[in-house]
Amino acid sequence: LGTYRMALLMTRTGLVVLTLAIICGAFGVHGLGSMVTENRLETWETAVRYQAWMSLSMIGLGVSSFKVSSWAFWFVCSGLLIFSGSLYALVLLDLGILGVVAPIGGALMIAGLLLSAISLKPCD
């Protein structure tokens, strides 16, 4: 593969893997919680965490020569603020109702990452 194609492959792969990390994290919380032991759930969370960090390294290796849709950036940023912000507030303020807000942020993060993967273009 040429330099351009390799950078594109690394970046797109990283974005898809990061998207899957978010999906796996949500599955761990909502799907596995009552089906596995606490120890196994912690192991699952460790796997998700490492997957996310490694996907970021792939993205970092590839992004230096690409432009991405600004919409993707704003989706990811707003999703992160809504998702993490609602969970932090849920924990700190003990407001259970905020748990229903988190999936909106998760959906925005997933949409932003997929839009990033689709909209990548080489810099001029």
Residue ranges of predicted features:
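Polytopic transmembrane helical bundles with strong interfacial aromatic enrichment
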Residues: 2-124
